[in-house]
Amino acid sequence: MTLSSLGDEYLATVPTGRSVTPHWESGAEFRDEIFVGGLWRRGTGSLIESVDPSSGKIFATLHGAVEADVDDAVDTGLCAVRQSGWADRLPHERAAVLHRIGALIDAEVEQIATLQTIDTGKTLSETRALARSAAATFRYVAAAVETMEGAVTPSRGSYLTMSTHEPMGVIGSITPWNSPIASDAQKIAPALGAGNAVVAKPPVWAPWVTLLLARICERAGLPAGVLSVLPGPGRTVGDAIVRHPGIAKVTFTGGTDTGRALAHVAAEKLMPITLELGGKSPTIVFEDADLDQAVAGIMFGVFSSSGQSCIAGSRVFVQRSIFDEFVNRLVTATNALELGPGTDPRTQVAPMVAFSHRDNVSAMVDEAVLQGAKVLCGGMIPDEPRLADGAYYLPTILSVTDNSAPICQQEIFGPVAIVLPFDNESDLVDQANDTVFGLACGLWTTDFPRAWRIAKAISAGTVWVNTYKQFSISTPFSGLKDSGLGTEKGRDGIRSYMNQKSIYIDTAGQPLPWARTADNR
Ligand code: NAD
């Protein structure tokens, strides 16, 4: 099935004025093919039915991979990095390929964004931004790889000592459905840039854009076999990747329970693993905050992407002196948010990725209400007829008095914010840190010494002050506590796909004295 087979009605909603005909091969986006060891072939695994969450209609089907494909992909990946010379290619030569991948992504932003919007429901403005960010990631990694240096370390004898970095081999990349092209780029670009092969497993709910990225990598001149893309279920294909003895490292983004299970397997193999996991991030409004800025930032932080974001600022702590005024403003602004399909440029809150996920979010809210949470807005599936066919959920604000309520402790991964009052800094820090997660935090205040104090006191990998959900590929990203293990992005993120090696080179030109050879006796 191709994009154009979706019909004129769909195409009329693509607001770009550009053709959506694929630039490389007509219909390539939805070909029923997976990418194993440099070859496109029909999968023999279970059938994936891709549903447009704004209409409930199946727009494409794909046969997924099976465990045997993992063996093929890893074996070919190992050969490919060696035989193609990818691992030994000079950094500026690898960088040239990454630059071309970035340029091709940029040239195809509309194509990629449209594909991802159909697959995930997200707004086109968001999927365009994700595609541009993926291009920027490849360019950043290209520049960083080309300029990375090893070290000549201070010597303690007659030898030259060096610290160098080498590729690891084949990297397993396992990603979730919420921001596919950006998650892929964040893992695949540094892993390739470091000279590795990659076996990528995209999620069942959003496999297409990763397959499209593989076609772009092929066009950019990435040697055959260096990248494989194996869509399929996590419990079979994903599990086989993590357990495979030829996989040197796994980089995973997804839920905390899944990440913990993968970490056990990695421990058995003594294999490094990077985990980017779930969150329940606090966002904090002090009485001296610019309230317009805070309302806009908090809404963006929790309701953009329909709340399907690991860093969603889902616990909103408001100083008691402004609690009523601030919450009223937040509720009024939230009620005015525009719901609709991701293809409509007016849409702020698009459908959720899948009906079953929407229903889980709805059930969690219902349960919270039974346990005493008060619904300040939303709290239900919208009843507007125009939204009846999509996986929509109203942006919701719940009020609870106590951060120990289950709804304050569990990740919802939907458009649901919980407001809680606080009295002073120590009460706030105790409550904000009272969760198993430690991913992100937002602070809204004009008192900068206070912003500094609280930023240091909160257990989170990222803290935003008077802004939220802003990212830079050059700035490391990591989660504390149950939110993750290891770091992505930045130069350290690239190094995490390399083995460090120390080399000692003798400069004396003499046998070591201990051996007492004829010359030194
Ligand atoms: P998930 O854990 O269900 O799945 C993530 C990926 O892991 C999918 O590709 C899935 O098929 C695969 N998988 C599942 N079981 C597996 C197994 N046993 N072995 C190997 N692979 C397996 O998560 P999800 O529902 O796709 O994504 C939502 C979660 O991701 C949320 O918890 C969210 O917070 C988290 N997330 C975290 C970040 C971050 O950077 N910290 C970013 C985005 C999403």
Residue ranges and their predicted role:
Residues 257-402, 465, 512-513, 519-521:
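ALDH superfamily catalytic-core signature
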Residues 59-148:
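Glycine-rich loop-to-alpha-helix module at the N-terminal edge of alpha/beta enzyme cores
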Residues 2, 55-60, 247, 284, ...:
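Conserved C-terminal structural/oligomerization subdomain of aldehyde/semialdehyde dehydrogenase
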Residues 81, 85, 102-109, 113, ...:
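Structural signal for hydrophobic packing residues in well-ordered secondary-structure cores
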Residues 149-293, 422:
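Rossmann-like NAD(P) dinucleotide-binding subdomain of oxidoreductase/dehydrogenase enzymes
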Residues 38, 56, 94, 116, ...:
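Residue-level signal for inorganic ion chemistry
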Residues 2-55, 80, 380:
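Hydrophobic face of amphipathic alpha-helices that form TPR/SEL1-like repeat modules
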Residues 58-65, 82-86, 173, 283-286, ...:
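Short, well-ordered beta-strand elements within core beta-sheets of diverse protein domains
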